[in-house]
């Protein structure tokens, strides 16, 4: 596909030409629909030069309900990965969907005269600069929290929320009605738009699919500035493109999320295995059953001293004497973590159900620990750990995380090499591992997964300790990640990255496989100038190649278009 580079747009002062230009621009950018404002989109009479001060002036001239700032850009120049420093030119604080649409249409109108790109930023929890827009515009999506969270009861209850709302607020509000979303991430202080642009996977995904599986409707601002309402039956291509689409096709401004009755309590259970085959077999057994736990995850523990004694602060052992005799030093262990939801009046039957399920498993008997906690406390468990790390100054540090999706057929070979040879400890962060059943997932989203019904999420979640050396050093952890990836490639394990990050077109094409052409075609349809989500490093904005008038001409003549891919993007500057 490609953008023809032979045509170049030259600015002219002739008023007649400007009139024709405006007609063509407006004809190739459909008008907005379902906006939360009655304002019309203001368009500059002249295109500003590429000079940053002229670009700033053009942004200031926009008629917005919110506002644009230029002074605090360093606050959004980093993300949770904390490895890159890429300040934008400006920050948009939108008060309405109209503000986002106006900004997008303005940048489309500028065409090849500017380098402006746009990144929608929620809580900034991307890992490798995906939510950054170097010298572009960052949209602070948390400013877009109006109208309020709206909950609808009935046979199929749902909640309407802003794309900038965070999941913990949705949980708190829906619980007032005895309801809750079905599928979660492990950390709830993330925005709706952020998780739906990736997938949103946690221990409920085997039963309900990821969060993108539980969306009825979306409102999207596309890369052209169009505001589109979409669902499985209405504008379905855009709907499925955006879900798991890495922010490439549009900005999620509203979402309608499926709900279910919420429990009051959970029984939270942990058990240990020393044999990976037994561990993975039991995990797969649990996710295959109709009547099973409501949450199934697991994690790897390598050479951890006094492990079970550390659990006692939150969990109670089934057999305290036997638990005290268990030694974890020097061992590679696998923890199965499961949860059963219940209400107080169901406690007795819940105990019977969990007892029966546990009796069918092959864990080490002395390692059974459990706890009963409120539903919201369990779901918000990572935030409790966050507060402790913040107090120690260990939250805002580099996070060289690696998230992989591994086919069932490859998981044993992966575990044998990685957990026994490549890794010697995991004291600097957890390693999650659990299977999901893909047969219950929607098939048409942009999310890329292995081509097997059952695959495992394996997440390496280390933190690089500041001013450290050895195994806690950032460079060491990055090299360790690369060793894992090199092994996967050499062994041909057919692994896919979750929250992917690649540097070259070849790598992105390999990631998408046979779906690459569809992905690129949808990019052309919804964001033809490649304005959105530059930090993903998939496409580069077509600066100096095509303006809207040339784009319209190329469509009219059927001229081929060419995108510029990640292979020619400049390397981000490290912090």
Swiss-Prot record:
Coiled coil residues, start to end: none
Domain FAD-binding PCMH-type: 84-262
A single cellular component GO annotation: vacuole
Keyword DNA damage belongs to the record: no
Signal peptide as annotated in the record: 1-31
Binding site for FAD: 120, 122, 124, 126, 130, 186, 191, 197, 201, 252, 498, 536
GO molecular function: cytokinin dehydrogenase activity; FAD binding
Glycan-linked positions: 14, 38, 115, 303, 318, 437, 467
Keyword tags: FAD, Flavoprotein, Glycoprotein, Oxidoreductase, Signal, Vacuole
UniProt note on tissues of expression: Expressed in shoot apexes, lateral shoot meristems, growing tissues of young flowers, and weakly at the root-hypocotyl junction.
Entry EC no(s): 1.5.99.12
Induction: Down-regulated by jasmonate.
GO BP: any one term: cytokinin catabolic process
Function: Catalyzes the oxidation of cytokinins, a family of N(6)-substituted adenine derivatives that are plant hormones, where the substituent is an isopentenyl group. Catalyzes in vitro the oxidation of various types of cytokinin nucleotides that are known as direct products of cytokinin biosynthesis. Promotes adventitious root initiation downstream of MYC2-dependent jasmonate signaling. Cytokinin degraded by CKX1 is required for cell division in the female gametophyte by modulating the expression of cell cycle genes.
Recorded family membership: Belongs to the oxygen-dependent FAD-linked oxidoreductase family.
UniProt-recorded name of the protein: Cytokinin dehydrogenase 1
Organism of origin: Arabidopsis thaliana (Mouse-ear cress)
Gene it is expressed from: CKX1
